[in-house]
Design a protein with these regions (language model features):
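ABC family nucleotide-binding domain
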Residues: 2-219
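Conserved switch/coupling elements of ABC/ABC-like ATPase nucleotide-binding domains
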Residues: 220-225
Length: 225
């Protein structure tokens, strides 16, 4: 099966004047197209750092990244990296990262604004994905008028509006109660199943991880299984 993310010999070291911390050590990982992968481990083990490197939000100290068959040149400009992220990747975070002054429809459109998509097309696509996550009746509401689960649905709609190959989710149910968390997981599984969309999820929840295709575990920056 096609590999959409390939990490080879990834190391990440954070340095200050007096301290050197190795966040990731010699990580080698392949993620297959259409796979739903969970990354687990204790706090501070490097999970989110790994996800940020996969998402081109952070650079490894050493090692190589391939995304959808393209080797990522460490010398790429910030603008080019942003373009790759916008076209290839969707992001879902624990804290939603919605703009509080914008309503649901406007929040969801943001990735297409960055792409320069015309307004009528943006609105059409935004309404489609908002309906898909079950929030058509909340389209004009602002984030402060929504529940946590509804805010995460908006964030997922925003993440998929550009039809990215890969969805990266960092503790997507971490701020939700068990009922809302289960609903978000069902939505993610549906996107994976119906679209064949690759999903990489960082989670502390063993029950949720057990429902995914594969689990990898980290400890002290090293992959242990």
């Amino acid at each position: 099966m096609e590999t959409v993310i390939k990490l080879t010999g990834i190391n990440k070291i954070y340095r200050t004047d007096e301290v050197e911390t190795q966040a990731l050590e010699n990580v080698n990982l392949e993620v297959r197209k259409g796979e739903f992968l969970s990354i687990m481990g204790p706090s501070g083990c490097g999970k989110s750092t790994l996800l940020n490197i996969m998402g081109l939000l952070d650079e490894p100290t050493s090692g190589e990244i391939e995304l959808c068959g393209t080797r990522i040149d460490p010398k790429l400009s910030d603008n080019r990296l942003a373009e790759l992220r916008n076209k290839t990747l969707g992001f879902v975070f624990q804290s939603f990262h919605l703009i509080p002054t914008l309503n649901v429809l406007d929040n969801v459109q943001l990735p297409l604004i960055y792409r320069g998509v015309r307004s009528s097309e943006r609105i059409r696509l935004a309404k489609e994905v908002i309906e898909r996550v079950g929030l058509s009746h909340r389209m004009k509401h602002r984030p402060t008028q929504l529940s946590g689960g509804q805010c995460q649905r908006v964030a997922i709609a925003r993440a998929i509006i550009g039809n990215p190959e890969i969805l990266l989710a960092d503790e997507p149910t971490g701020n939700l109660d068990s009922k809302m968390g289960a609903e978000i997981m069902e939505l993610l599984h549906r996107l994976n199943r119906e679209d064949g969309r690759t999903i990489v999820m960082v989670t502390h929840n063993e029950q949720q991880a057990a429902q995914t295709d594969r689990i990898i575990k980290f400890l002290d920056g090293r992959q242990i299984m």
